[in-house]
Structure formats: C-alpha cells, structure tokens
Amino acid sequence: MTDPTDRRHRTAVPRRNSVPRLRGRTRRVVPRTHWLLLCVLVVTLSAALLLQGYTHHMFGITSDDVTGPRGRADTVPGQVAHGGPVIADAAGSPHTARPKAGTIALTFDDGPDPVWTPRILDVLRRNHVHATFFVVGTQVVAHPELVRRIVAEGHQIGIHTFTHPDLSRLAPWQRSLELRETQLAVAGAAGVTSSLLRPPYSSENDALDDADWSVLKQADSAGYVTVLSTLDAEDWQRPGTARVLANATPHGKAGQIVLMHDAGGDRSQTVAALNTLIPRLKAQGFRFTTVGAAVGMAGPVQPAGLGNRLQGITLIKMLQLGDGTIRLLGVLMYTAGAISVLRAAVVLVAARRHRRLRTGRRARPWGPPVTEPVSVIVPAYNESAGIEAAVRSLVASDHPVEIIVVDDGSTDGTADLVESLGLPGVRVIRQRNAGKPAALNTGLAAATCDLVVMVDGDTVFEPDAVRTIVQPFADPRVGAVSGNAKVVNRGGLLGRWQHIEYVVGFNLDRRLFDLAECMPTVPGAVGAFRRRALLALGGVSDVTLAEDTDLTMALCRAGWRVVYEEGAVAWTEAPASLGALWRQRYRWCYGTLQAMWKHRGALVQGGAAGRLGRRGLVYLLLFQVLLPLLAPVVDVFALYGLVFLDPLRITALWLAFLLLQLLMGLYAFRLDGERPGPLWSLPLQQFVYRQLMYLVVIQSVFTAVSGSRLRWQRMERYGTLRAPAGAETSDEGRPPRIPA
C-alpha cells in the first residue's frame, strides 16, 4: 500500500530512525586524453615490435652451408668468376681487385659479439694488426659500443646486412632495406658509413651464380663494393684450432682475404688460432692490413652525415626499445600466467572446501531457523520495464516480508505502476531524485524489521530466496549475507558470456571470500543485512559508485561477518549490448577502486578488518586490477609469437590456459547446479569480452589516478524478467504480511 504522506510531499521519510545521507559532489568527466595516449603508445609499440620481430626472427645467423646447392652461372662475367675477391662496378663494366702480394686482410663476419669480438680485438691490438669487420645490423643495435671500439682502434667496418638473410632469395626492396638499415645502424652507433659489402653465405668468386650476380649488381647500384674471400677458415664449423689455423694459412706469397667469424657461436677456436696465425705469418714476411688498404681503395669508410646519424640513432633506440619491450612482455606474460594459475588453484580448492562446509554431510546449521519478518527495500529509478515482475516475485516469497519500494524521482511512472498493482504488504515511498544510496537510506529509515533485504528493481527472487538468505543471521556474528545472482537473459553470445562470468567468476570468488572471512561485496541485486549494523555505520554512503562494495567493506571493518548463501537465488537482467555492458562494468570497476582506496586502512588493522585488508583487498588488487592490466600484455605477446616465434608453441600455451578456464567453468557450473552447455562459447569469450573487460579496468584505473569523479548511470532495462509462477495478486494461502 502507499503512504499518503509520502505521496503528497514526494520526499517524505519517516523521522524515527532516520539515516543521515552522505552526500558527495560529483562531476561527470569523460576522460579521453588517455585513450589518445594509449593509441599513440600502441602504434609506437606495434612499430617497435614489428621491426624487432623482423630483425630478430625472420632470418638470423646460421651456418654458411644452409643455402643449398649452387645454381647456374650463365650471367656471371668470366672476369668476375676468375678474378679477384673485391668486385666493383658490377652493374656497369665490372672489374675486380686482389690484395697485393705478401698482404693479408683479416675479415670477421657476423659480429659484433659481446664475448668474442672484444677478445679478437685484444689479440689484434697486442699484435698491432688492423682488420675489417663485416657487421650485422641487429648486432650493431645490440652492441653499439663495440662498433665504436672497432672504429676507434683503426679497423674498417663493412656491411653484412641487417638480419643475415640469403640476399639472393629476397625481393629487391628487401635487399635495399637490409643494406639501408645496416648502414643507418652503423652511422648511429659509430658515426661512419661504409661502402664495403659482404653478402651472407658468400665465399669465393667461383661460387657465384646468377642469383648472386643479381645481388651484386643491385648492391653496386647502391654504391657498394662487394668483398668476397680467398681463404675460408671455416671456423663456423668448429673443426678444432689446428684445422682453423691450417685453413687460414696461405700457400705461397699471394695476397689473401681471410674469412673468419667473431660471432654466431663459440669462437674460442678462432681466438686461439689468431694468437698463432698472426705471429707466424708476420715472421714469414706477411703484412696485415684492412681490405681497403690491401687493394688500394680510397676511403671506403667515411664520416656519416648528420641526417644519417640522427636516423641511425633513432633506429637503434627503436630497436632497443623493442628488445626491452619483448623482454618485459615475456616477464609480464609469465607473471600473468603464474597469477592465473595461482588464482585457479586457490579458488577451486576453496570452492570445494566451501561446498563441504555448507552442504556436505558434516555441514553445521547456522542455528535455529530464522522466521522473523524481513523488510525488503527496492530502490527504483525509471524501472517500469521490470518493477512489476520484481515486486510480484517478492510478494510470492514463502517468508513474511514487508516490501518498501522507494521511487527515486522516476519519470516513467514506476511508482504509479507499483501502486496500481494493489499488492498486499507493498508500500511505495516517493522522493526527489537523489541517487540509489539516498533511496536505500530512505527505505532503511522506513523499515520496521531488524533484517533487511536490498533488491534492485530489475531483479526477480525465487520464492524461497528471502527465507534462505536470512538463515545465516541465526549466527549473531553475521551482519550481511550475499545471495546468488543469476543472469536471466542468457540468449546470444553476450548473454552467455555474462552468464559464464556470473557463475565462474563472481560466485567462485564469493565462496573463497566466505571461507577466508573477507567478503568485499554483497551485490545490490540480492543482499541481506542487519538493520542495526547499517544504522551504526550511518547508513549507505554515496561517496563511491559501488555503494554495495563500500557498505560491505565497512561492515567487515566494523567486525561483522559477511557470508555467501548460494541457495538464495535471484534473477537479474544483464546488459544486452556492448555499450551498456561497458557502462555497467566501468561503474562497477571504478566504484570498487574507490572503495578499495577508501578502506585501505584495513591493511594494517587487526581482526575482521585485517582479514578484509590483507586477504580481500590484496586479492582484489592482484586478480581484479593487476591481472586485467596484464591481460593486454598476454594478447600482444601471443600475436607477436604467432607471427615471429613458434606458432605451435604459442597455440599450445593458449589452449592450456583455455583448458584451465574450461575446467574451472565445469566445476563452477556443477557447484551452481547449472547445465554446462553455455561453456561452448568460452573460447569465443577470449576475443571480444575479455578485451572489453580489461579495457574497462584500464579506463577505471586512469580515471581513479587522474582524480576524476563519475556520476551514477542508470542501466538499460529490457523487460525480460517475469514473476515466478503463482505470484498472483491475491494473498490467500501466503505467509503473513507485515502491515505497512
């Protein structure tokens, strides 16, 4: 029935037992700057990762015999095939050059390497010998200080491509990119450029084929002189120091270009061979010099221009950023995986134990049956789509109730609709729009029972839900009880995904919180409280957007125990669009962060408050804040791995985590008495729903850190709820009602 006084004055609230309202000024802020920054970060990160992936995983340094058999050599000029190892003007009138007699040009490929290049440089310095180092761009980026040392100690730099591919198998644009990026890396690292090129997997002139010749002609057009070799130490095969020494030793006094390696594996045999080779050949009258000096080239290495140096420095920084990012992503991904596995183990063990304690053979009752009447408060703002079903379901309860519908300034006739139903034991109180906490406080002030159930206007109760949810109050330590909210509109993928989340996420967590005595949230859809406990707190606060979480945490800190009653089932409408879901979860997440910050003092308190702080708040921080923040890392690394790493391994890891989620889902559905059919959509949940959830957390964290305040947003209602069978308007055969 309707209180005529409330109806006349619209905002009247019973004066006795009034609850003070906590008002907080809010301003609606739609933060957008961080999304722009996030987009810039994503674009920059993507570019760095793509470049890093290409440079580190598309090709790479491998043994010199991996390119297969030699092809036809119909287009290779005879003077090149039988000429000297230094080839110039390949695109025009090609000519070659040989080192002068008695001259040795030591050359080292594939470096610089942080272990072996310094040791080789030390050997060269002790013997007062200069050499030529054909560097790989990725190694230059990783160790620019070694390139600077090579140049500073008087050695020559040559280009050995950026990623060490077989250039003959690349498209012309890829060849140009390989040479250009290596040149920029050298310019950025040491401030020089080089016109010397040694293609990977090359050897002597007579090994050139038509594909190789096309590479040499393109390189000549770009201004490069190709440097092959006359002696191959074959140190990459690690045949033993004696064999390396023999391979690098010339026969006779002819000038030689010796091919060796300062990277690409263990080069201890190379270092040992050099310690013997250089003194021995010097004693035989050989002179050691660089490639340029050996063939009389004028200045193959020149200072780089300012533009090239700046571009090179930028390239190095970008690639170093990519390298560091990949290392960080790897650490974060394994951290996220460990946290996920830890959560799964803890939640599953806790859920099993909770089930045994509550419904097993050794389960203990809370105490004598609770039969005292209950006040049910329904805050309503523009709830005409579902309020009738909600109220009728409450009227159909098998427990004595008084139902107080607090209309918070609705403009859609919500209050009139409830009044027109003429249901017994139902009272409507009208007030100007002041928000949900104010409406709850109004209902709390009007309630006549010590036990209070709070119900959202879009929620339908099972007939036994009220009776079931109040039974834990037989224990005088219990101050609040969380019910079991279920999604009613499960049609479509979005509905199924939310249904899975409610069963697997929310309800499994509540079992853990109940067991650990650190329940952080009694949901607004279905929760029961001791009225005197709420009055002692000053009522429902409006300083956060998650008034239910704030209230529950306050009760825990006041020493009350908060428990979960899985048998108290209520059906609620879930958002039916991604936009509505975003708004709901944004409010939930932001409000939860507000409540966590407000009650952070519980971390250092003792007793029930300490359990909330050190168990509940830490759990929320780890699994509802940090883990979602790490989720994008997992996605980015997975995409990176599929493109540049082993896709089978990445897929196997993804399937393993999916299997873990499926096992959790099956167990949670079994505990909740649900059919597992909707779990078929779990794999699809990983591609839209999951991303939406972690973006919500990112948005909420930014909003919280920036100090913005958001206004409470009403959810869309769809009218899919129906009252349970038997909820007629007659009160015949029903439990006694409390007069309004």
What does each of the following model-derived ranges do?
Residues 2-106, 113-126, 275-280, 284-323, ...:
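N-terminal pre-catalytic segment of deacetylase/amide-hydrolase enzymes
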Residues 64-193:
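Active-site beta->alpha N-cap acidic-glycine motif
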Residues 141, 162-280, 286, 293, ...:
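Catalytic domains of cell-wall/extracellular-matrix polysaccharide-remodeling enzymes
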Residues 338, 342, 347-368, 619-706:
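Membrane-embedded multi-pass helical conduit in multi-pass membrane proteins
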Residues 372-375, 402, 535, 550:
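Cell-envelope/extracellular polymer assembly enzymes that use nucleotide-activated donors
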Residues 392-401:
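Short, acidic, metal-binding catalytic loop of nucleotide-sugar glycosyltransferases
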Residues 393, 407-416, 434:
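A conserved acidic beta->alpha catalytic loop
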Residues 432, 437-441, 445, 449-450, ...:
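Long helical/loop segments within the catalytic core of UDP-sugar-dependent glycosyltransferases
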